[in-house]
Structure formats: C-alpha cells, structure tokens
Amino acid sequence: MRVILLLAFLISLTECQWTSEDLALYDLVEEVGVNFYEWFDIPRDASSNQVKKAYRKLTLEWHPDRNSAPDATEKFRQVAGIYEVLKTTELREKYDNVLENGLPSWRHPMYYYRRMRKLAWYEGILVLLFIGTIAHYLMMWAAYFEKTLVYKQNVKKSRKSKKEDPAEAEKLMKQALEEYLPKYSELLPIILARGTVTLFKNLALTAKDAMTPKEVEPEEPTEEELAQQRRQQRAAAAPQQLEFKFEVAQGMKAVSTNDPEMEKKYAAENEVVAQKQSGATWTPDELASLVRLSTEKYPAGTPNRWEQMGRVLNRSAEDVIAMAGKMKQMKQEDYTKLLMTTIQQSVPVEEKSEDDWSQAEQKAFETALQKYPKGTDERWERISEEIGSKTKKQVMVRFKQLAEMIRKKKTNDT
C-alpha cells in the first residue's frame, strides 16, 4: 500500500512538472515519426508565413474531400497538429529541444507516465498492482533480513555473557525468524482479496442485523423506582385489618310486616328460636355473621330487619337487637381481636405461586441487576444464578413486570 501511494505521489509530481501541451507534443512526435520540418518542406528557421504556405499546401493535398486514400483523415489531423506546434514560438522551441535530445527515455518518470495515460483504468490498476506486489515482496524480505541481523547480534551478546547455550540460542533464533519469513499467502493481491471478502461479509452481516427487528429491551428501573416498588410490595404483603362499620337501631321497635300470615309464621319461628337459643353465648362466627348481615344483606331501613337476621342466626330478634347494642359500645381494638380468629379461619390460604417473590429474592434480584448491567453476556443466566431460587424465564418475566409497572406509573403521573 505504501508503494502504491509512493507511485501516485511521483506521478502527481510528474504531472505538475509537465503541462498537457508538452504531453500532447510528445505524443504527436511519437505518432508522426518523421521530422516536422521535412514533412512541411521548410527549413528549421522558417518564418510564420512559410509555415502557413506549407500548411495550406498540405491541407489541400490531404483533405479527405480531395484525397481518397484510406489514411487521408489521419494525415490531415497530423498536419493540423504539426501546424499548431510550428506556429507557436514556445512549442516550436520545445520541439527543437526534442529534435536535439530526443523524447524522455525509460530512465525518466515521464516515459512511464505517458504510457500510463494511454492505458484503460483497469489496465492501470493491474500495472500498479503488479508493481506494488513486487515492491511488497521485496520489503517483506528486507524486514526478514533486518530481523535476522537483530537476532544474530543478540546471539553474539548471549555468547559473550555465556547466559545461554549457543546451540539453544541458534535454535530459538530460527524458530523466531520463521514468523517473519515471507510467504505467498501474505502477498499483496492475496491480502487485498482476503480483505475484500471480509469486508463484504461484514457488510452483509450489518445489513442483516439492520433489517432484523430487534426486541426493545425495557428500560432498567432506577434505584428510587426499585425502592418505591419494595415499599409497595411490603405494604401489599402486610396483613390488613378489616374495618367494620355497623349501625344499631336504638329506641325503635322491630319493623313488622303487614302480611298477617307472615306475622304468624315469624311469631312461631321466634318462639321456637327463643325457647332454643334464648340467653345462649354468642360465638365469634355468629358475631361476624351479625356484622355482615347488619351492614350488607339487611342494612338499616330493611323491613323486618331484626326478625330476618334472627332467622339466619337462629336467634330471637330481641337477642339480635341486644347484641347489636353491646357491639356498638365495644372498642374497635377489642372488636377487631374478637373477630380476628374467625376472619383468618374463613379466608383461604393461597398457595405460593412460582411467580411470587419474597423480599430476600427481590433484594437479590436488584443487587444482581446492578452487578450485571445491560450488555453483559448471558446476563439473565447470571442473575438467575445469583438469586438461586428463580429460573432465567422467571427473572426475565419479573424484569418486564417491574418495567411495565414503572412505565404505567410514569404515564399516570404525567
């Protein structure tokens, strides 16, 4: 490559030294092949008028309309070119110099430049590649001999200091020089071909990657967002105390129905219940049912409210009214403790799902996210190993869930 650049630099210097008129003059002299003055039949010191007369005579002789010779057109063009040289004092002096000294020889850069100008672009590339290959091959041998001299000097120094065995040092030197020995696989055309193939492969892979839709990885949550997520999880995991609101009628009698048959039925049921349950102790289940019935199923204003609640509880309306009044006077803390056992027994315990994360697992997950940032090879496998109790799939699902929750929160905030 350095050789090719050097040749291009020399060619540019050559082009700057000679003008296009000089190059055209050299090409014309080489093409005509005869003395311009002899062809025009004039002396070397002929005047401009003599040159014009000779030019008119030759144009009439070689004009394609007057001369039917096959080379008439070519001769007519050469006559016009010679006239352009001889009529100009500067070009005429340069032509006289060519007559005395001749055209640039092979020792001169102009010789090669003039021939390069006549080649096609691909021919010029082949010539430069050939020259560059030879120069590159010679430079590889020069580098090899340079390394040889350096190693030989080191061997001599080791012999003088007696640090190494001479035979062993010679063997090591040969092994080291094998790396610098010129090889045909390192010639310039092979290097260029190999580089071109590698370039096209990389371009194909780049184009394939650009056309393949990539899965957008969600943004990683920040420390503040993770801390807020932990607080929300702890709040959701903490047992919540149920707040019971109830109303008890005071100074009122039970509402009775206007249906006589229903009144008789309710009266008979009340008597049975009163005989069976009057004065019995209320269980926590009955207390919970009483609160639920008084607030949800039979709220204030329901006809025959206390009688209907008594039928459900198998107690008389008076017992229901009395207990409701007592519960209204109880403190909220005592009331909550009284019902806590029943509530815990009534609520089914959910089995822990595989997707549930404990606080320890969540903390290990956040620590692993910081330890293996985005772009780490096999990131999700390493994070899964750090947690220990979660698979790669569960880790990825958890990450997407957190990112989605944070994204929704940002959207709601805005």
UniProtKB/Swiss-Prot annotation:
It is a single-pass membrane protein. Gene3D superfamilies: DnaJ domain, Homeodomain-like. GO terms for molecular function: DNA binding. PROSITE patterns: DNAJ_2, MYB_LIKE, SANT. Residues 217-226 have a biased composition (Acidic residues). Residues 20-59, 274-320 form the Myb-like domain. Residues 211-234 are annotated as: Disordered. Residues 352-407 form the SANT domain. The chain crosses the membrane at residues 125-145. It is found in: Nucleus membrane. Residues 1-16 form the signal peptide. SMART domains: DnaJ (SM00271), SANT (SM00717). Residues 35-99 form the J domain. One of its GO terms (cellular component) is endomembrane system. Keywords: DNA-binding, Membrane, Nucleus, Repeat, Signal, Transmembrane, Transmembrane helix. This is Uncharacterized protein F54F2.9. It comes from Caenorhabditis elegans. The lineage of its organism: Eukaryota, Metazoa, Ecdysozoa, Nematoda, Chromadorea.
